[in-house]
């Protein structure tokens, strides 16, 4: 967490819900979106004072139907699905009012970052924005 903050991160996203990490981020006043996939993990997130979580891995855990089902009893929670989100399903996810944002490795590949191909990353980012604003 400290390395991310020192590098300029404005928020933290993690694959799972670690209460120690959440509390540390809260002490540092940095928003955190821990990964959850079950009602029990959402209960933990609520207990920690969170109202936005990463739903991960989204497609493996039922995708948008699962988010909708979890949203019924946890109407105060918002979700950021990642894991299996792609150009074909991102608009469907974003059409649900409990989905705050989506993440996907299809938008920025490690190889492009490592190669310093930031113009290509900019182009892919523009394409992703166009995809969801059509």
What are these regions (language model features)?
Residues 1-7, 40-48, 72, 85-101:
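Catalytic cores of alpha/beta
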Residues 1-2, 8-17, 31-38, 42, ...:
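Catalytic beta/alpha-barrel core
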Residues 68-69, 91, 126:
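Active-site phosphate/pyrophosphate- and oxyanion-stabilizing loops and adjacent acidic/basic residues
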């Amino acid at each position: 967490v400290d390395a991310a903050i020192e590098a300029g991160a404005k928020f933290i996203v993690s694959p799972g819900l670690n209460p120690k990490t959440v509390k540390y981020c809260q002490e540092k006043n940095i928003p955190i979106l821990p990964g959850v996939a079950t009602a029990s993990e959402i209960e933990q997130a609520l207990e920690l004072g969170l109202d936005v979580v990463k739903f991960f891995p989204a497609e493996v855990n039922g995708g948008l139907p699962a988010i909708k089902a979890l949203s019924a009893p946890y109407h105060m929670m918002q979700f950021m699905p990642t894991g299996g989100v792609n150009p074909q399903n991102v608009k469907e996810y974003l059409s649900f009012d409990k989905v705050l944002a989506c993440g996907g490795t299809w938008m920025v590949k490690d190889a492009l970052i490592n190669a310093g191909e930031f113009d290509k990353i900019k182009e892919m980012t523009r394409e992703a924005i166009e995809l969801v604003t059509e």
